[in-house]
């Protein structure tokens, strides 16, 4: 069976975001409002208003979904763990008509999961990128390639993407 030719391929980490709407906090800013800090009393139980779980996001996943919604045939090159959140990401992307055949599922690894502390009109994100063995799959050259956020161990992978694009 011939491989599908995509118009848009996004490359980057996929994540599930948990947006936690914080109820009470104090914000301390420098006099010029350039640097602000959200503060909670250490050791307190901090109430929150609500939490919204958004699977299959991140710069590259968002770009792939956006391209698909605009009518382009779109795929994502990414990695997920073999956990509930990985399956949920794959299902969400498939429902958005994003090709998932270039997403590697890694046994014994967790899917990236970030906590977004959302207070008033801003947010702070607690992030952790799993260290996946990044590998560029074989795919036909699309007119558009989007590369974004990857884990700290991805320097060699960046070179592989550069070499692919230059070939």
Question: For the regions a protein language model found, what residue spans apply to each?
Answer:
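Glycine-rich phosphate/adenosyl-contacting loop at the front of the ribokinase-like
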Residues: 2-77, 87
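Beta-strand->loop->alpha-helix junctions that form or flank phosphate-binding loops
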Residues: 78-82, 101-110
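Subtilisin-like peptidase catalytic core
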Residues: 81-84, 119
């Amino acid at each position: 069976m011939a491989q599908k030719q995509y118009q848009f391929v996004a490359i980057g980490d996929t994540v599930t975001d948990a947006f936690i709407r914080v109820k009470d906090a104090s914000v301390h800013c420098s006099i010029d409002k350039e640097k602000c800090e959200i503060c909670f009393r250490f050791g307190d139980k901090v109430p929150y208003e609500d939490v919204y779980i958004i699977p299959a996001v991140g710069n590259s996943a968002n770009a792939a979904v956006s391209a698909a919604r605009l009518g382009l045939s779109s795929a994502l090159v990414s990695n997920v763990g073999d956990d509930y959140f990985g399956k949920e990401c794959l299902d969400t992307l498939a429902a958005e008509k994003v090709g998932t055949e270039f997403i590697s599922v890694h046994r014994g690894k967790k899917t990236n999961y970030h906590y977004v502390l959302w207070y008033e009109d801003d947010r702070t994100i607690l992030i952790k990128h799993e260290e996946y063995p990044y590998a560029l799959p074989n795919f036909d050259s699309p007119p558009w390639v989007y590369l974004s956020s990857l884990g700290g161990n991805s320097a060699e992978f960046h070179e592989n993407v550069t070499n692919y694009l230059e070939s």
